[in-house]
C-alpha cells in the first residue's frame, strides 16, 4: 500500500542529500595521486592570504606550509600547494596540499586569526592512522557527483511512487473487459 511511508521517504531523501552536501563542504578529502605522495583537499567559501597547512607527525614534529607563498620560500618540491575553483561545490574554492605519504600524522588547514596575527583558527583537519584511510585520486574533491546521484535517486523514488499510485488505482478499478 501507498500509506504515509512513501511520502516520508520522498520528503526525507532530498533532506538527506542536502545534509550530505552540507557535511561535505568543510570536510577534508584525502587520496594518493601516485605512490609515495598524499593529497589533502579542503573546500572553503573564501580565499585568504593567511592560510597555511600544518602537518603534525607522530614524533611531535610540526611542519607548516603556506598556501600562498613565493617560489623561493621553504617548501619547494617536498610540499606542493594548489588552489582551484570548484563550480559545483557549495564552497567554491578547493585548497590542496600534496606531500610525501605519512601515516600516524594529523594535517590541518589553518588561518591566522585575530587582528594582529595572534592565534589561529582550524578550518579542516585530517587524521591518518593507517594506509587503509587513503584512496587513489580518481575523483577529485568535487561534490557535483554526489549532488547528481542524490538528484537521480530523488527523481527515481518520486517516479516509483507515482507508478505505485497509478498501479494501485488500476487494480482497485479492476480489469477492463471489452465486449464485442
Swiss-Prot record:
Q: Does the keyword Membrane apply?
A: yes
User: Which of UniProt's keywords are assigned here?
Assistant: Host membrane, Membrane, Signal, Transmembrane, Transmembrane helix
Matches recorded under InterPro entries: HHV_UL121
Q: What does the record say about its membrane topology?
A: Single-pass type I membrane protein
What transmembrane ranges does the database entry give? 143-163
Predominant cellular place of this UniProt entry's protein: host cell
Name its cellular compartments. Host membrane
Keyword Signal appears in the UniProt entry: yes
Output a single Gene Ontology CC term carried by this record. membrane
Q: Which residues form the signal peptide?
A: 1-27
- UniProt similarity note: Belongs to the HHV-5 UL121 protein family.
UniProt name for this protein: Membrane protein UL121
Q: Identify the coding gene.
A: UL121
Amino acid at each position: 500500500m501507498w500509506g504515509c511511508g512513501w511520502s516520508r521517504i520522498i520528503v526525507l531523501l532530498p533532506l538527506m542529500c542536502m545534509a550530505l552536501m552540507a557535511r561535505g563542504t568543510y570536510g577534508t578529502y584525502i587520496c594518493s595521486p601516485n605512490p609515495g605522495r598524499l593529497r589533502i583537499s579542503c573546500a572553503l567559501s573564501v580565499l585568504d592570504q593567511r592560510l597555511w597547512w600544518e602537518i603534525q607527525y607522530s614524533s611531535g614534529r610540526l611542519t607548516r606550509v603556506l598556501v600562498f607563498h613565493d617560489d623561493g620560500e621553504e617548501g619547494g618540491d617536498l610540499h606542493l600547494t594548489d588552489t582551484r575553483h570548484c563550480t559545483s561545490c557549495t564552497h567554491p574554492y578547493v585548497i590542496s596540499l600534496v606531500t610525501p605519504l605519512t601515516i600516524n600524522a594529523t594535517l590541518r588547514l589553518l588561518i591566522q586569526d585575530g587582528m594582529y596575527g595572534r592565534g589561529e583558527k582550524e578550518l579542516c583537519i585530517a587524521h591518518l592512522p593507517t594506509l587503509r584511510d587513503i584512496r587513489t585520486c580518481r575523483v577529485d574533491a568535487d561534490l557535483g557527483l554526489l549532488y547528481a546521484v542524490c538528484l537521480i535517486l530523488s527523481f527515481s523514488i518520486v517516479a516509483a511512487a507515482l507508478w505505485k499510485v497509478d498501479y494501485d488505482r488500476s487494480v482497485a478499478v479492476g480489469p477492463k473487459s471489452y465486449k464485442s
